[in-house]
Every structure is written in structure tokens, then in C-alpha cells.
Amino acid sequence: MESQCRPNVDGVHNGVESHVKVVEKPRSVGSSSEFVLRILGLLLTLIAAVVAGVDKQTKIIPLTLIKTLPSLHVPVTAKWSDMSAFVYLVVSNAIACSYAAISLVLVTMLGRRGKGGRVLAVIVLDLHMVGLLFSANGAATAVGVLGQYGNSHVEWKKVCNVFDSFCHHLVASLALSFLGSLSFLGLVLLAILNLHKKSSTK
């Protein structure tokens, strides 16, 4: 009796041939979006850190000590390590880049089988990266505005009219860093959307 009820190896059950097609479930859109955003965050923060980290320009500046004497021409170098705000920008992007690489590996390994605690830890760290990058971008932007326009109230002169290449590289680094912070912000928003979907389906 048991042999009559069991299907044969070739897919024949009680004299009727059946064709079973196994279809793998495609990766969800949310997982694909998360992967893309982490790759973008990794690349953007890496390039931002490199662009700012190699930023350096030397110019010959005329220096007048006494009005009756001719000006002295002194070589002056502007580099990112001269200002703490720019150091903060480079270090923050380096941290975010390293975290993006590690989180990319973790998320790939965890997949859908990841425990809730580990997934929540990644989301919290994503949120920390958003705060870190936005604070670094804000600090560097404030110093950059002073370099571009100066401050007449405290007699701070603008320097970007002299070190133009230096300032242009910093603007490019800031733009990349800002886009990188938006990538991490997108990850946080995506996580909130996924949590909302899970709670609504329960």
C-alpha cells in the first residue's frame, strides 16, 4: 500500500507524470537598494577623504613689513591639516568609509536570517554615520565660507582668492561627503520603511 502512495523518483505519482519547477525567490527590492546605498556610501566617502587628504597648494605671497621697504615674497603652503575642521572632515569620511565596508560584509553575511539585535545594531550605526558626516560637513563648510568671503567684523581676510585650487578641491570633497551622508541617511529611511512594512503585516 505504501509503495502505491509514494511518488517515483522520475516524478510519476499513481500513473500521472508531474512536472515540478522550483523557482528561486528573487532578492527583494529593499535588499538590493540597501546594497547599492552601501556601495555608494563606501565609494563617496572614500573619494571625499582622498580628495581632501591630498589637498595642498603653495603660493608666493608678497609680504610688506615696512611701507618704505619693498615687499618680501614668501612661499606659503595651504594644506588640509592646518585647520581642525578639515582634519575632522577627512577623519570622519575615513571612519564612514571603513564602516561602510564592514557593514557591507555583515549585511551580506546576515541576509534575511540575521537576528533582530544584529540588524538593529547596524541601523543604529548607520544613524551614527549620518550624524558624524553631517557634523563634519557643517564644520568644514563654516570654515570654507570664511575662507571664501572672510569676515570684515573681525578683519579676517579671505584666502580662496589666493589659494584657489586648494579651495576648489575642498568644495569637491565637501560635495562628495554630503552625497555620502545622504547615502547613509537613505539607509536609515529604508530601514524605517522596512520596519513599518513588517509591523503593518502583523
UniProtKB/Swiss-Prot annotation:
UniProt topological domain (Extracellular) ranges: 55-85, 140-172
Membrane-spanning parts: 34-54, 86-106, 119-139, 173-193
Main location: membrane
GO annotations of cellular component type: plasma membrane
Record note on quaternary structure: Homodimer and heterodimers.
Similarity remark: Belongs to the Casparian strip membrane proteins (CASP) family.
Protein name: CASP-like protein 1E1
